[in-house]
């Protein structure tokens, strides 16, 4: 929200514009820094979008929030920051009152949408933690897209007033500076969503802490599960058993003992085996267990069951660890967003309450203003530093682009050099895909 006043003055017939507020060196430095911010914002957030849409590890429905958030940051970098930079360097608004109204509305829209996105993400995480089974079944792409649409509608409603409350002046672009509007817009656009985010993440932390204190440990890592077919206790001397091991010493050791076996019974008139699952084990007689049927008795292989259970447990653990990493990353994103925008909104609101008595220095206020814009370029950096899945996806995207350029250059070579180059390109791409 640009509240920088212009240095333009009007005479009766002519418009006299004061010199630029910065020296050439200072202006060049500011342009360079802001250009880097714009470039990082666009490239980084485009990478985020491509990574979420193409990486298998990032294709969860809830990550669509990150795609929408990245789109908002790209729009800030393309439709807001360049005009703010021009207004800052020249010292007056050059683009007319009509675009000024749209510019201020877009500024409020994208800033508000960013924090409302983070608010929606925090609620999504909270529901996934507190209502894991029921909510995760409802956590479909369609539902997430509906939530994203609501986020943008809320942001659009909040950003509508600047279109009708802008001061119409060809040489300055100022938003409504009335106290009621400053306080209400700051409350709705920042403080209220920020309070909701912080409260929700505190609850998530509390729930996670309670769960981590309750640990269920099964002996040997797994509990014994009943087999899919009927499980009986049968005396060894009444049946001829097929055991994986025909060792005589093992047979002597098991003799006259009641052992847990897997009974697969098939009727002579049926080709398909009939199996039934019993939750309670029963002690039965051999004749009652298989009356006039072809019976095959084999020892239960706990190794096969254990391997299946380990595979399921491993997948569940990987999903839980990925969810924890993402929750941590989003906590960092939320914290950085608050740190970037809090100084601006605090001084903006404080000035509306106290007036000139607590007005911050102009240079400090401008610094807070531009720190808020820097947030658009920070999220991709956070994803890269703190999340391994994003790091792998970014690396894969960059390497694939590099491999594509190498292939293009290979097409210009001849003979064996061409074939060798193409082979190396494919090899690098395949190695990277295998590693991921």
From Swiss-Prot:
Localized where?
Cell membrane
Q: How does it sit in the membrane?
A: Multi-pass membrane protein
Q: Which PROSITE patterns does the record match to this protein?
A: G_PROTEIN_RECEP_F1_1 (PS00237), G_PROTEIN_RECEP_F1_2 (PS50262)
Side of membrane Extracellular, spans: 1-27, 91-100, 168-178, 354-366
Is Cytoplasm one of the keywords UniProt gives this record?
no
User: Which controlled-vocabulary keywords does the entry list?
Assistant: Cell membrane, Disulfide bond, G-protein coupled receptor, Glycoprotein, Membrane, Receptor, Transducer, Transmembrane, Transmembrane helix
Q: Where is the composition biased (Acidic residues)?
A: 257-267
Any S-S bridges, and between which cysteines?
100-173
What is the top-level taxon of the source organism? Eukaryota
Task: Kindly report the protein's main subcellular placement as a broad class.
Answer: membrane
Named from the GO MF annotations, one term is: epinephrine binding
Question: Which residues does the entry place in the Cytoplasmic compartment?
Answer: 53-64, 124-144, 203-329, 388-436
- Give the start-end ranges of region Disordered: 238-280
Q: Name one GO cellular component term.
A: plasma membrane
One matching Pfam family: 7tm_1
Q: Which family does it belong to?
A: Belongs to the G-protein coupled receptor 1 family.
Function field:
Alpha-2 adrenergic receptors mediate the catecholamine-induced inhibition of adenylate cyclase through the action of G proteins.
Q: What is this protein called?
A: Alpha-2 adrenergic receptor
- Species name for this entry? Carassius auratus (Goldfish)
Give the organism's phylogenetic lineage.
Eukaryota, Metazoa, Chordata, Craniata, Vertebrata
């Amino acid at each position: 929200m640009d509240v920088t006043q212009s240095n333009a003055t009007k005479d009766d017939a002519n418009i006299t514009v004061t010199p630029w507020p910065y020296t050439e060196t200072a202006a060049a430095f500011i342009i360079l820094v802001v250009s880097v911010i714009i470039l990082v914002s666009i490239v980084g957030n485009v990478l985020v979008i491509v990574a979420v849409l193409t990486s298998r590890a990032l294709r969860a429905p809830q990550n669509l929030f990150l795609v929408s958030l990245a789109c908002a940051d790209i729009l800030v970098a393309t439709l807001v920051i360049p005009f703010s930079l021009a207004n800052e360097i020249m010292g007056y608004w050059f683009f007319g009152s009509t675009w000024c109204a749209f510019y201020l509305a877009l500024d409020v829209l994208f800033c508000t949408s960013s924090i409302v996105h983070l608010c929606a993400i925090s609620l999504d995480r909270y529901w996934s933690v507190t209502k894991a089974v029921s909510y995760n079944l409802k956590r479909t792409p369609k539902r997430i897209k509906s939530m994203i649409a609501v986020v943008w509608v809320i942001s659009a409603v909040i950003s509508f007033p600047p279109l009708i409350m802008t001061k119409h002046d060809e040489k300055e672009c100022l938003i409504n500076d009335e106290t009621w509007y400053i306080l209400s817009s700051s409350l709705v656009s920042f403080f209220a969503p920020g309070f909701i985010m912080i409260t929700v993440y505190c609850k998530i932390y509390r729930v996670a802490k309670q769960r981590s204190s309750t640990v269920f440990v099964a002996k040997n890592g797994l509990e014994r599960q009943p087999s899919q077919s009927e499980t009986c206790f049968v005396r060894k001397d009444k049946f001829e058993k097929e055991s994986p091991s025909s060792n005589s010493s093992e047979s002597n050791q098991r003799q006259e003992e009641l052992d847990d076996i897997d009974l697969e019974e098939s009727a002579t008139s049926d080709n398909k085996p009939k199996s039934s699952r019993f939750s309670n084990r029963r002690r039965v007689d051999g004749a009652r267990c298989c009356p006039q049927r072809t019976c095959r008795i084999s020892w239960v292989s706990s190794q096969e069951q254990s391997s299946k259970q380990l595979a399921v447990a491993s997948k569940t653990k990987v999903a839980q660890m990925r969810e924890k990493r993402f929750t941590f990353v989003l906590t960092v994103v939320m914290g950085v967003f608050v740190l970037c925008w809090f100084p601006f909104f605090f001084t903006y609101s404080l000035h509306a309450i106290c007036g000139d008595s607590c007005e911050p220095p102009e240079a400090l206020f401008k610094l807070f203003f531009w720190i808020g814009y820097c947030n658009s370029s920070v999220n991709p950096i956070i994803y890269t530093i703190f999340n391994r899945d994003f790091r792998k996806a970014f690396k894969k995207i960059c390497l694939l682009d590099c491999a594509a350029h190498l292939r293009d250059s290979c097409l210009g070579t001849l003979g064996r050099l061409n074939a060798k180059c193409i082979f190396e390109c494919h090899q690098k791409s395949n190695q990277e895909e295998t590693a991921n």
